[in-house]
């Protein structure tokens, strides 16, 4: 396992490049959750993202008992849980505070390594977190040593840059995979794709670490049928791709079962040839014509829709990502605001029929 140093951390804060995410593990038997965490630690994994169902915290706490100093926990302020332990998105200070204290208790610890502003995708959302006092709360917790580092998760480069501008951030969680980073070529080398790489370079330069979510695009890149490229990549290729991006310290693929963990652990023994992802250089715009790759070349939308983000949440929801579906419901402007003006379709380099997509997206979420 390769370990990378947190730029703004002390010399002991080194993460294995392979971590774990628990977004879909909430329905897994608690004994299996404990076994997964223990086996992961035994194999050198020491970074765990705790955006997950409430039922996950206690078994994780039991698994790390006696080994707390060996692991790093990334906890999200704004991810909360209902009476059944199901994940929810929240912007109420009292609920966020209560949830965090409960998480500490369940985990059996008196501190977390990273306290994250959770899923901040719009400027108005960041404004809200400041307004209700969550950012100040994180600063207080850091001063007390209860939160070691402040970070955030986002899907939006412009918002991410604004949060980094505060000077408070040591870690950012961002989705990175070949599908999200695809662009047609020099003619279209502007907008969202360039913004993403500029953001990653900024993080590298300023010492903000990146933890990577969605390295497999919710599993879609692993299937020729579902991949936007029409060709399957492997777990090893996707993980190496994410780890090679500027500023990245750790990739956190989601696991739900011991079999999932075993598959991910194969990365540690994979050869350079097995990790080689140069095949993506052969993918062309024709390969993905008709598929939204969230490049946002269609922007600005006259109705104010973030078309790339709306499509991303929709595709992830279709792939079974309930957290992404929940995030969609919190957007300030959703698919139902579409004016059917065709502006986006005129600008789309991939010939995506976004007007009909907006109708389908609205209908899909209305039925959930």
Regions found by a protein language model. Give the residues of each.
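N-terminal binding-site loop/beta-alpha segment at the start of enzyme catalytic domains
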Residues: 1-75, 110, 143
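Conserved, mostly hydrophobic/aromatic
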Residues: 6, 20, 48, 60, ...
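N-terminal small/glycine-rich loop or linker at the start of catalytic domains
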Residues: 7-25, 74-87, 116-119, 216-221
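Active-site mouth loops of central-metabolism enzymes
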Residues: 21-31, 81-95, 123, 223-232
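A cross-family glycoside hydrolase active-site/sugar-binding cleft signature
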Residues: 21-23, 49-51, 74-76, 115-118, ...
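Glycine/proline-rich, positively charged
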Residues: 31, 42, 87-211
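Structured C-terminal cap/extension of enzyme domains
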Residues: 42, 46, 198-368
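Short hydrophobic/aromatic-enriched beta-strand-loop microsegments
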Residues: 70-75, 168-177, 271-278
